[in-house]
Each structure stands twice: as structure tokens, then as C-alpha cells.
Amino acid sequence: MNRLPFLGLLFALLCLVTCRQMNEAHLLHLAEKQVNMNVDSVYALLVQIERPSQLSDEERLLYGWLNAYVHYKRHNSMAEDSLILPASDYYVFRNDTAKNLFSYQLKAWYWYWLKEHERCIAAIDSGVALAKALQDTGRMADMLIDKAYWYVYVWKDYEKAIETFRTAIALDARAGSFFSMGIAMGLNKNDSASYYMERSIELAVEAGDTSKIVHYLRNYAQMQAYSFDEPSGAIAVSYTHLRAHETRSN
């Protein structure tokens, strides 16, 4: 009879642990549903998971994948996101096309943060090949933009960067791609840089994205002043686009 209180306490503790595990698994799957919607929501849900080691093997892989996703989206270091490697293999096994495809980007950036640049490019090239096979032009453009970024800032190979950005723009002509192409061309002293910078600003104005407009104008002005020694031209362009933005806003 004396063992009954002990057994009752043990049962209560088991229930508490089980409930906690169920709650944390629930948080994990809620976070998964926010992917490609709101990265801040994914992060807010993940930080509530206090004991990821208590998750099942499958759930731990998802937890690692989601953390890598958050770090990628927030441009944070991914040097500790080693779980992305087994997670990627798992999603290949599960035939989860969406996660598998995105995993190539996450793996590539993981290798980038570890300064394993050859592995970084190999991962992104594999991802581009899969995206092409799946006819996912948006994801393919994303990966090519990443690859071009590394050509600019890791290898300083501006010609390859320009070629890669051009392919990405042909797939998906977004403001950020034109802006990055303009930067690469400016660094390469290419006169066509102005066209791409101005086109990026035009697209940002059309979208009404004030933060991008300011960012692009500031960088364009710096490029004109320091790379092409044309500060007056940069000022004129800045004024024209700011007036266009004000007109659209009113």
C-alpha cells in the first residue's frame, strides 16, 4: 500500500512529460505551417520548444531544418546548423519535394558559413539542376542569385556573377536581381550598371517599397560617385525617382 503514492507521483510525472512532448511537437508543426509565410512566426514558435532533445528523431530533423530556414531568412550565421545535412537526406528518402529542393539552398549556405566554398557551389548546382527538372523557375532564380552573390563576394569573379545574374533575371525579373546585377557591373566598371540600378529603382517604385527605394538610391548614388565619378548624375536620378514615388503615394 505504501507504494501507491509513489506510483501515483510517477504516473503524474509521466503524464506531465508526455503532455510537454505533445505540446512541443504541436509547436513544431505550427512552425512548419508558417514556412514561406512569416519567418518571425516560425522563430517565435521554435523558441518555445525548451527540450528539442526530447522530440522524436523525425521531429528533431524538422526542428533542425526549421532553425536553418530561420537563420537563412534572417541572414544569420548557419555555422551550427549541421542538422540540415541529415534532414536533407531524410526529405529525399521521404520524397518531400518542397523541403528537398529548399534543402539545397540551406545546405549551400551552411557550407558557405563554414567557408567550404567548393561544397557550397556543388550544393547550389545540384539544387539548380533539380529546380530545372521540376520547372520551378522561382526557386531556380533564387539559387542562381545566391550563386552570383558568392561569385561577387567570395571569388570577386564579376564576369561569372554578371552571367549568372543575367540567367536569374531571365527566369524572374525582380527588383533585387536588377540591383545586384547593377552592383556586380559597377564593380566590373561596366557602363550598363546604370541601366540595372535604375531598373531596380523603377520596380521598387512600382511596388511602393519605400525601404528598397531608399536602399537602392543610396547605393546607386555611391556607385555613381565612386565608381563612375558622376555624383551629379546620381543626384538627378535620385530626385527623379523620389518624385515618381511621391506622385504614386498621393
Which residues make up each language-model segment?
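Tandem amphipathic alpha-helical repeat scaffolds
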Residues: L27-N36, G64-H75, F102-K115, R139-V154, ...
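Helix-turn-helix repeat elements of alpha-solenoid scaffolds
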Residues: Q34-V47, R74-P86, E116-D125, W155-T164, ...
